[in-house]
């Protein structure tokens, strides 16, 4: 039996190597990393569940690998027979094992990317920027701008000082991996990285081997499934943990790299600490669009918790700074302040660890920083009191109420050190601290509020009806605007205590009350989703005025659907034409564009092109009115929701639309991929800043008129094709719900938000995330590619010369190239054979021809795509990405087959399966075995024991393997 196992392990390794598309490069370690983690895991699986269960995992892998090699549907049926013959406990273990192996494969790939990056940095050899696996390095970008594009170092420095990248973390429910597991994955990644370090000793290796074994086993023993949905407060705490763990220290570390990169192009001064190069905002606890769980109380709690956390992080660092600032020499300004503070200081403060006695005046910096420490302590305690009790006795003068109060003494210390010739000391930890304060302020992040436009209409309708002037809801757009402007120009209050309020109206008004009560630096933008007209913006301005919000939030319309994007330029023209509004915005406006809903509404092709045109148009209009426009990009993680490699997405934006100001969402699982580890955080900050700078200083070309004309024609055809299938095909919704796990999506408990805006309804009411998620699970990715094939076919059949034009567009126009490359990547991850299996098992016989026609469309679209890109095979220009996908495929295929058969058993209780006896012989004589315990983790399931957990585990595993949920 032992020899047989060695053979099995060898065969897995052999299959791995067969799947790799040739030797990628000399620095290719992916297969090595992957095989090491796999070997460790299989040993653990055998220890915990027996040799035979490990063999079942290997059998599944081999059948999947054979299918991936030959695409023989019989192999899927063999695999299905094997999986359905397992008892429920073993099924859970198999699903859990493959999900776990995919997470390990992701860790191996992350390490491979980091390893290759280090090699390239050492050698100075940077890959082609058009390649989807590489991104801009800040130093390389500076050098390219100066040496290849003839920009002066001063021009680069000035552009960088005037640049702002604002990353907005959202609680979109696409993070399917529990936080407990993410932390364990981080430790596995660290162990593996250290194992491959050059200077490792035999003892180190042994200890790291043990640690790796321990962490892999701990992850496997952790329940992957969230048993209850997270609350908005849970989501906010999870989001804030990234600041505590990586972003807080990552920002000053990154800014030091910026200093170094500037020095290397001849700029001999540091990047100013108060230049807002990187800013952070959040939607966690502020996004109430379709989420009834985000209440005014939640928003208040989230803001106070963030302020408490921020002052606590500053407080935990201030004593280290006091230890460092031991110098006695200072300028007269600081000496006078220190003596004044010394006279009024408390004698002993016993609750401090360091410097608890009165600090003598011959340590002037410590005296100043001691006062900062006292105020930070009080600021933290006051936030805690307000959070817990709703009130605090600590007075305003004892705390920091705005960031300028905290910066002032720190700047005084910095100036004094520089005046005394101690620049080198000033530019150490003190500069890092100043940069943190400038970036994070007192609130850590600025909380955006997002609300549906219809909620504001409801409130104003209640007001106008109460005032006896008619129904606001029924007024025309012109009448609404006229009334809103009249009220905004006047001073009469509109809301009295006797206003009749529904629950929804009260909730909306109470949100404005919270905005008025809390410090203004807690908040960022007020975003109106489903914005369609000028009155939507004026309505929020009026409600802010009504609640006397001291510093009103900037109001940001979010244009999402195709028709709204088309109407956006006219709406912005009308707004900018209003004298009252132009005075209010003071030359600055932000507009948000939604990638998710526009894609769901019209398909990826038409949405991408309309988003491009809308950006061009609204930027042009803003310029005409002398307004600086910031475009806020609401991008998801998946290609279907506007995702893709950051640097490529930015460099493909229309010229003159970023202009040094970028605001973009970082959603769900992308937060972990961007900030889960220190090196990931560093890479994320670098890629956003470098790509934004490059877009401004070396903008992409504008499309030629004939390209625009062709794109317009193709977009009409693509939209028609997409909508004819998704909205006009009478039985499409029925097919979609049968062929995918859409109905079961909510059981994953991955977000606080319901998956539908309205409990009943079809595709229109379904949120973009479960819409994309469902098709990602079946590896058919319909929302991404549907419409492309019809558009290309129409263009080429109309005029054969158009093929040449499309190929030229691909070679020379970044927007078009990126659009095609991202869809090509999705095709590389796709597998219509899995969709065919789902149809065979889950779809009624009369609907199967519909699925067949969609799969024929898939193949035709893929062929057109390859023709336009000039590729013989998918991803032929990106061997590393191709390798990573092909290594994962056999794991994902097992989970796809397991999911299809589990759905069959859930939906058809009469479906007959023949169970084989306990496959773990070690436990055959015992009344139960370790796998049986897993069934009892979900005692309340409405399905047969174990089926629901098996299904959820397959969903999570496939999401990990595709590296996308929704």
UniProtKB/Swiss-Prot annotation:
What's the domain remark here?
Region 2 (296-437) and region 5 (645-966) are involved in the acquisition of C4-specific properties. Region 5 (645-966) is involved in L-malate tolerance.
What does UniProt list as catalytic? 172, 600, 641
PANTHER family, sorted: PHOSPHOENOLPYRUVATE CARBOXYLASE (PTHR30523), PHOSPHOENOLPYRUVATE CARBOXYLASE 3 (PTHR30523:SF33)
In its miscellaneous comment, the UniProt entry states: Ser-774 is strongly involved in determining allosteric behavior of C4 PEPC.
The effect of residue 600 to R/T is:
Decreased bicarbonate-binding and lower catalytic activity
Summarizing the annotation, the consequence of altering residue 450 to G is:
Loss of catalytic activity
* Keyword Lyase among UniProt keywords: yes
Which SUPFAM superfamilies does the record associate with it? Phosphoenolpyruvate/pyruvate domain
Q: Which residues carry this modification: Phosphoserine?
A: 11
What is the name listed in the Swiss-Prot or TrEMBL entry for this protein? C4 phosphoenolpyruvate carboxylase
Q: Which gene encodes it?
A: PPCA
Q: Which UniProt keywords apply?
A: Allosteric enzyme, Carbon dioxide fixation, Cytoplasm, Lyase, Magnesium, Phosphoprotein, Photosynthesis
The chemistry this enzyme catalyses reads: oxaloacetate + phosphate = phosphoenolpyruvate + hydrogencarbonate
Q: Which cofactor does it need?
A: Mg(2+)
Instruction: Give the family, as the similarity comment puts it.
Output: Belongs to the PEPCase type 1 family.
Question: Which pathway is it part of?
Answer: Photosynthesis; C4 acid pathway
For binding D-glucose 6-phosphate, which residues are annotated in this chain's numbering? 283, 450, 597, 635, 665, 753, 767-769
* Alphabetized GO MF terms: phosphoenolpyruvate carboxylase activity
Q: Which domain of life is it from?
A: Eukaryota
Role of this protein: Forms oxaloacetate through the carboxylation of phosphoenolpyruvate (PEP). Catalyzes the first step of C4 photosynthesis.
| UniProt cross-references to Pfam families, sorted A to Z | PEPcase (PF00311)
Impact of changing residue 774 to A on the protein?
Alteration of C4-specific kinetics, but no effect on L-malate tolerance
Its lineage reads: Eukaryota, Viridiplantae, Streptophyta, Embryophyta, Tracheophyta
Activity regulation, short description: 5 fold activation by the allosteric regulator glucose-6-phosphate. Low sensitivity to inhibition by L-malate and L-aspartate. Up-regulated by light-reversible phosphorylation.
**UniProt subunit comment:** Homotetramer.
Stated EC number for the protein is 4.1.1.31
